[in-house]
Amino acid sequence: MLDALRAVILGIVEGVTEFLPVSSTGHLLLTARFFGLGEGAFWDSFIVLIQLGAILAILVLYFERLWRVAIGLFSGDTDSRRFVIGVLIAFLPAVVVGLIAGKYIKSMLFNPWVVCFTLIVGGAVLLWVDQLRLKPREHDATRFPLLMYLWIGIAQCMAMIPGVSRSGASIVAAMLLGADKRAAAEFSFFLAIPTMIGAFAYDFYKNRAEMTTDHLGIVTIGFVVSFITALIVVRTFLDYVTRHGFVLFAWWRVIVGTLGLVALAMGF
């Protein structure tokens, strides 16, 4: 029963934070530290597995759009082919950096102190970018210039540091490069598909010994909760940022990071 409750809580945290610019990894690490949830080899793998629930939410929400791209890709449509190439270009930097420095980053930087500091710094950056008087030139996430896709992919590599936020890094980069807020957020969703599936495949292979059929029920609970939560959050998030920007999420990061530092300093 306790494991099922853990799965529900972690599924909610994952589903709520995965596509918001607040760092799902950071929130999951802090949840494990301060509430004693998700600690241990199995739970490390569990957190990666339930990310697929969040990815499924994106596939469901954007099914029609992605299906058109898939059909266009095989029928020779230039725009569809260009978009797929763009996503692959944006995805490749994370593959390269992950293979070269992934083990070092995980062993040296995956701790709550780093998370809290990066939450605060990332919040300040997000607040700064949101206040800039940018003049967007790109309004369709499927039609960014190819070089723009590359720079977004390079920026996404910063999110390997826990607390930075994959979506936050890609959204900030896209906005600075000329995308409007909605297009920037949508491309971060699309880029998440290969990035998170790749991370899942690598982590699952590496930790496959930790996963048994005994864990199937717990993983299913986390997967379903993550899927439903992400489905609700993504719909709400896009409408909200289009109207109000990212100030709320910036301050959320700063507050959570500050409270985390205070708690750590007090010995929690």
Question: What are the residue ranges of the model-derived segments?
Answer:
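Multi-pass membrane proteins that catalyze or facilitate reactions on polyprenyl-/lipid-phosphate substrates
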Residues: 1-268
